[in-house]
UniProtKB/Swiss-Prot annotation:
<feature type="active site">
    <location>
        <position position="339"/>
    </location>
</feature>
<keyword id="KW-0964">Secreted</keyword>
<comment type="similarity">
    <text>Belongs to the 'GDSL' lipolytic enzyme family.</text>
</comment>
<dbReference type="GO" id="GO:0016042">
    <property type="term" value="P:lipid catabolic process"/>
</dbReference>
<dbReference type="InterPro" id="IPR035669">
    <property type="entry name" value="SGNH_plant_lipase-like"/>
</dbReference>
<protein>
    <recommendedName>
        <fullName>GDSL esterase/lipase EXL3</fullName>
        <ecNumber>3.1.1.-</ecNumber>
    </recommendedName>
</protein>
<dbReference type="InterPro" id="IPR001087">
    <property type="entry name" value="GDSL"/>
</dbReference>
<keyword id="KW-0442">Lipid degradation</keyword>
<dbReference type="GO" id="GO:0005783">
    <property type="term" value="C:endoplasmic reticulum"/>
</dbReference>
<keyword id="KW-0443">Lipid metabolism</keyword>
<dbReference type="InterPro" id="IPR036514">
    <property type="entry name" value="SGNH_hydro_sf"/>
</dbReference>
<feature type="active site">
    <location>
        <position position="342"/>
    </location>
</feature>
<keyword id="KW-0378">Hydrolase</keyword>
<feature type="active site" description="Nucleophile">
    <location>
        <position position="50"/>
    </location>
</feature>
<feature type="signal peptide">
    <location>
        <begin position="1"/>
        <end position="32"/>
    </location>
</feature>
<dbReference type="InterPro" id="IPR008265">
    <property type="entry name" value="Lipase_GDSL_AS"/>
</dbReference>
<dbReference type="GO" id="GO:0016298">
    <property type="term" value="F:lipase activity"/>
</dbReference>
Length: 364
């Protein structure tokens, strides 16, 4: 039998993604990314929405929660932890790739230990967004309230390791900011809660809010921030159902709004780099790689990209995806999406493998 450890391939530029993923799938053990010399990242800390929520909504009175099966069926021991996924989410996977830990707990996890604080937590809340109205519509934790929890976190870390080490952790950790999808999909288009804004002015509100949030983080001593752009939100299963017509095509207006927001977010972060000494905000283009996975699923080892694995795959998400009313597809690994809104852990792994080296090196 051929030894996969010595397996190699020669790739043309046009096929580099397929080659990379072939190596990923053939390798059974995950090796942490090799950091540049002298680059130390002690913790991963996340803010934002359901993409990096690891359980903050569990004790919040909202319908935007998932601390029940079938969520978590591929998590450790098949436990539903409040992650909007069959398994782990990007915050977990990035922490693992960086050699920090395999699970990033929610800050409000009742089982949280002091040592967990030192290597990172998530403050993110599913359903939140840059628009202050977005979290209010579904009664979840706003970015402003997430920042208040972060203030508590800083004080706790200082009490554990002292002022100097606390400053080091805050300055050198990888901070993730992932939001915008719920603003576009829910607040602006589905609920029409901002009729006074056109798409251009609304995406400006979003990008301004993102810039202001990063500036506030800077005031606490944060220097390394990876800010994720909006995904092709019009192509997620639920938005195909709601806005893609009878054929459930991608909702082009949703995608155009996402691209417009991204086109404003990136230069905003470049501007902060010039005005805030020492900060390193990195724009993460998630739109293009996820869009390519959705449009060409077979290239990445998937079969289904227009429906989720839970229930019909067309609309079930959060409380609608439950073990009483929703069955689960026979093989989660064939699906790009777990429910009608969130990717599977396998999809997240593909995205992380494609993106991590591109931005980690920028923190040197």
């Amino acid at each position: 039998m051929k030894d996969n450890s010595s397996w190699s391939c020669s790739c043309s530029w046009s096929s580099w993604k397929i080659c990379l993923l072939s190596v990923l799938f053939l390798t059974e053990t995950i090796t942490a990314v090799k950091l540049p010399p002298k680059l130390i990242i002690p913790a991963v800390i996340a803010f934002g929405d359901s993409i990096v929520d690891t359980g903050m909504n569990n004790n919040v009175k909202t319908v935007v929660k998932c601390d029940f099966l079938p969520y978590g069926i591929n998590f450790q021991s098949g436990v539903a932890t409040g992650r909007f996924c069959d398994g782990r989410v990007p915050a977990d996977l990035l922490a693992e790739e960086l050699g920090i830990k395999s699970i990033v707990p929610a800050y409000l996890d009742p089982n949280l230990k002091s040592k967990d604080l030192l290597t990172g937590v998530s403050f993110a809340s599913g359903g939140s967004g840059y628009d202050p109205i977005t979290p209010k519509l579904v009664a979840v934790i706003s970015l402003e309230d997430q920042l208040s929890y972060f203030e508590e976190y800083i004080e706790k870390v200082k009490n554990i390791v002292g002022e100097a080490r606390k400053d080091f952790i805050v300055a050198n950790s990888l901070f993730l900011l992932v939001a915008g999808s719920d603003d576009i999909a829910n607040t602006y288009y589905t609920l029409r809660a901002r009729p006074e804004y056109d798409v251009d002015s609304y995406t400006t509100l979003m990008s301004d809010s993102a810039s202001e949030f990063v500036t506030k983080l800077y005031g606490y001593g944060v220097r390394r921030v990876a800010v994720f752009g909006a995904p092709p939100i019009g192509c997620v299963p639920s938005q195909r159902t709601l806005g893609g017509g009878i054929l459930r095509d991608c909702a082009d207006n949703y995608n155009e709004a996402a691209k417009l927001f991204n086109s404003k977010l990136s230069p905003k972060l470049d501007s902060l780099r010039k005005t805030l000494p020492g900060i390193k905000p990195i724009y993460i283009n998630i739109y293009d790689p996820l869009f390519d996975i959705i449009q060409n699923p077979a290239n990445y080892g998937f079969e289904v990209s227009n429906k989720g694995c839970c229930g019909t795959g067309a609309i079930e998400v959060a409380v609608l995806c439950n073990k009483i009313t929703s069955s689960v597809c026979p093989d989660v690994s064939t699906h790009v999406f777990w429910d009608s809104y969130h990717p599977t852990e396998k999809t997240y792994k593909v995205l992380v493998s494609l993106l991590i080296n591109k931005f980690v090196n920028q923190f040197v």
